[in-house]
């Protein structure tokens, strides 16, 4: 079958956007700012291009992305060394480094620690296992304190008595399947058996209850975790053609498009052999609308800041979609590589 001129142009747009994001991710998240240390990975960049804050979880995501798409031992070593410094003290690193008033800095998330652990594991072949394993051992010590009395992982370790919000990220829920999957994939000896057992128990508790997660971002995390550890149980994405994208809340028909949610959905659809090509294209178009001319990815379509984790998810999503279409994808969709 001959590809129509529109199809060729459309797929060229996806390819160019993928490459712009990749170029942006290889440099922009590691930019230096006067109040932040070298080697940290930004969670978000201001309109000026300076990092707004450094984010350990996003450092983990970035290491996993770099290992797959842009391995650079010097840059990856700098990030691992930053994590080493952040986790060398008697208390956990701040969740958002450089932000004083963020409630997230009152505690530590097991999800974040698992993503950092995954990033260190992915970086180890490029920068050496000794340094990565040293940071992982420190993180494991804090994860051990997050095993609940029932043997399952707790989501949040409180470090400060100041009140914190009741949100999905501070409650147990199906999204913890992704936490557990990351820990179970760590190299032998990195994660103590007590934590690994807690990860297994957590998956058992939530694997049949994904529909109880009522926020799409978190539900897609749960589905990503299942895709890695129990692909036969992977839930289907409920898509509303009238909306054209997934809103923040499951079942809602209101709200704006969030880049991370749309990219997460597209990645999972690329792993589903029964997914509609039309629906995949709809998601790819929505993701594309969040990409700037410079390769930055906006959290909201009209946002002027640049979000790093949205860029990481969007880059992988567009790459997988391009691969499916046979027009220059770098990596074949693989649930084991879900970032």
Report each predicted region and the residues it spans.
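Low-complexity, Ser/Thr/Pro/Gly-enriched N-terminal "stalk/linker" regions
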Residues: 1-97, 134-152, 185, 281-282, ...
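Well-ordered alpha-helical segments within folded domains of soluble proteins
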Residues: 2-4, 51-70, 76, 106-125, ...
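Buried hydrophobic core positions in alpha-solenoid tandem helical repeats
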Residues: 25, 83, 120, 143-144, ...
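Non-catalytic carbohydrate-binding regions of carbohydrate-active enzymes
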Residues: 205-215, 232-305, 332-339
């Amino acid at each position: 079958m001959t590809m129509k001129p529109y199809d060729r142009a459309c797929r060229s747009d996806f390819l160019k956007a993928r490459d712009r994001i990749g170029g942006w991710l290889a440099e922009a998240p590691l930019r230096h700012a006067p109040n932040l240390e070298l080697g940290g990975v930004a969670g978000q960049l201001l309109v000026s291009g300076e990092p707004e804050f450094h984010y350990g979880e996003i450092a983990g995501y970035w290491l996993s992305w770099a290992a797959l798409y842009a391995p650079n031992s010097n840059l990856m070593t700098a990030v691992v060394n930053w994590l080493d410094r952040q986790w060398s003290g008697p208390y956990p690193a701040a969740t958002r480094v450089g932000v004083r008033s963020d409630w997230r800095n009152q505690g530590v998330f097991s999800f974040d620690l698992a993503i950092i652990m995954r990033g260190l594991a992915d970086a180890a072949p490029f920068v050496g296992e000794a340094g990565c394993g040293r940071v992982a051992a420190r993180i494991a010590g804090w994860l051990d304190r997050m095993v609940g009395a029932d043997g399952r992982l707790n989501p949040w370790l409180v470090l400060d008595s100041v009140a914190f919000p009741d949100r999905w990220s501070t409650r147990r829920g199906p999204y913890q399947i992704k936490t557990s999957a990351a820990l179970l994939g760590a190299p032998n000896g990195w994660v103590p058996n007590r934590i690994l057992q807690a990860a297994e128990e957590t998956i058992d508790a939530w694997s049949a209850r994904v529909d109880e997660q009522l926020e799409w971002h978190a539900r897609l995390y749960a589905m990503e975790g299942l895709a890695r550890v129990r692909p036969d149980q992977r839930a289907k994405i409920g898509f509303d053609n009238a909306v054209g994208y997934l809103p923040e809340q499951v079942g809602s028909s209101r709200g704006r498009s969030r880049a991370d949610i749309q990219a997460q959905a597209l990645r999972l659809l690329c792993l589903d052999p029964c997914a509609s090509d039309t629906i995949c294209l709809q998601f790819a178009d929505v993701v594309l609308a969040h990409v700037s001319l410079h390769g930055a990815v906006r959290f909201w379509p009209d946002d002027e800041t640049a979000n790093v984790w949205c860029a990481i998810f969007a880059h992988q999503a567009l790459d997988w979609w391009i691969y499916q279409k046979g027009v220059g994808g770098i990596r074949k969709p693989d649930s084991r590589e879900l970032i």
